[in-house]
């Protein structure tokens, strides 16, 4: 933690200098806007313009370290849930058809992500989700509705011996996974960014924990 001495500028204005390392990291320059928000405990939170904090890092996934295509798919889902926007999947040799098909299948089940570049040895996935367009309560409600319908369809298919209804329930399961992974991504992003948490409707950090529990039980179909 760094300390700064409060200086008086003019008749009544108080000022505090910003840490140089932080201003360089955030690429702050003269004339830029910074935003102050008061926390519930009285602390002040300083943030830069929303566009400046965009994560442009490329996260690497080495296929050679994945035992099979299922593990590869799980790794991609994990990176998506953690809020990563650009994921490069690569191998020291030509990607196998099974691996490519696994990547394509999993990206079809993840909202807002797609393949933007491809070669024999790598694929680049990019997620273009704007968290502010997904209010948390709306996403949670959607997950609840899907799982409720899926449960009813499953029970009715067993009672009536209706195979078509059973197939509908399986389709709902895939849709529930998609919404659950989106919800998990939003909550992970909210933990990392106050701007995201405010954008999706979280006012108290404890809400993140509560919604994580709700999401887990809402998608638990054991």
Feature roles, as predicted:
Residues 2-6, 11-13, 17-222:
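Cytosolic, long alpha-helical scaffolding segments
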């Amino acid at each position: 933690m760094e300390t700064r001495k409060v200086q008086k500028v003019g008749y009544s204005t108080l000022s505090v200098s910003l840490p140089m390392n932080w201003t360089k990291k955030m690429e702050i320059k003269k004339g830029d806007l910074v935003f102050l928000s008061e926390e519930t405990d009285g602390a002040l939170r300083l943030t830069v313009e929303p566009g400046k904090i965009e994560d442009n890092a490329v996260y690497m996934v080495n296929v050679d370290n994945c035992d099979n295509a299922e593990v590869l798919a799980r790794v991609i889902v994990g990176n998506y849930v953690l809020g990563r926007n650009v994921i490069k999947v690569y191998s020291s040799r030509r990607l196998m058809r099974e691996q490519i098909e696994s990547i394509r299948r999993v990206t079809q089940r993840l909202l807002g992500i797609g393949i933007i570049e491809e070669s024999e040895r790598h694929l680049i996935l990019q997620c273009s989700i704007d968290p502010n367009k997904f209010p948390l309560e709306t996403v949670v409600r959607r997950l609840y509705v899907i799982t409720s319908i899926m449960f009813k369809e499953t029970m009715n298919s067993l009672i009536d011996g209706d195979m078509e209804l059973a197939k509908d329930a399986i389709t709902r399961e895939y849709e529930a996974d998609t919404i659950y992974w989106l919800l998990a991504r939003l909550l992970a992003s909210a933990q990392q960014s106050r701007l995201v948490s405010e954008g999706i409707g979280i006012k108290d950090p404890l809400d993140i924990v509560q919604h994580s529990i709700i999401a887990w039980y809402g998608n638990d179909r054991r």
